[in-house]
Amino acid sequence: PFDLVLLDRDGTLNVRVEGGYVTRPDELVLLPGAARAVADLSGVGAPVVLVTNQRGIARGLMDRGDLVEVHARLAELLAPAGGRIDAVAVCPHDRDACTCRKPLDGLFREVLGRAPWADPRRSVMIGDMPTDLEPATRLGMRAESVGPQSPIDRVVARLLAADRACDGPSDVRRGEGHVP
């Protein structure tokens, strides 16, 4: 089993707005299979953490309240399939304005710092861009790429099947501290 599951948002769970940002809940459209994939990941017992760059905040296109509403809508869309997001780590900064914006690893280090029981080698990051995966790889996490030819539901099914085959019976850690 995994200690942590990290997910990118735009292009991984929801349709990416080309040249723009998801700034309102009604603009959030899940990709096919995303709700089922998150439900399957939620079922392994590891916290599921959204790790997302949201430069639209720095650009004044939205504020943190808008982002909270978008993420509340995401939770509503995932819930019927049994999926959940346990925590959200956001970089609201513009490029070159911080150390947390992917492909830097500040957000990943923050998540790991709040989950001291989690071993990066037993954690996975799923994203659609190389910039999503680079920090995970640097920190020793497994990195899985999704996209039109590798939709998230297929990637997750393969990932979980491989994990079950390697580990045998699971010893899922429940309640040993979730990322706040």
Language-model-detected regions and their locations in the chain:
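Asp-based, Mg2+/Mn2+-dependent phosphohydrolase catalytic module
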Residues: P1-D3, R64-A87, R95-M125, M129-P180
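Active-site neighborhood of HAD-like aspartate-dependent phosphohydrolases
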Residues: P1-V49
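Short, well-ordered beta-to-alpha junction loops that form the rim of enzyme active sites
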Residues: D10, N53-Q54, D128
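Conserved protein kinase catalytic core
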Residues: N14-R16, R59, E134
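Active-site loop/turn elements of alpha/beta-hydrolase fold enzymes
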Residues: E18, N53-Q54, P148
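Substrate-recognition element of Asp-dependent hydrolases with the DxDx(T/V) motif
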Residues: A34, V38-H71, D86-D96, A136
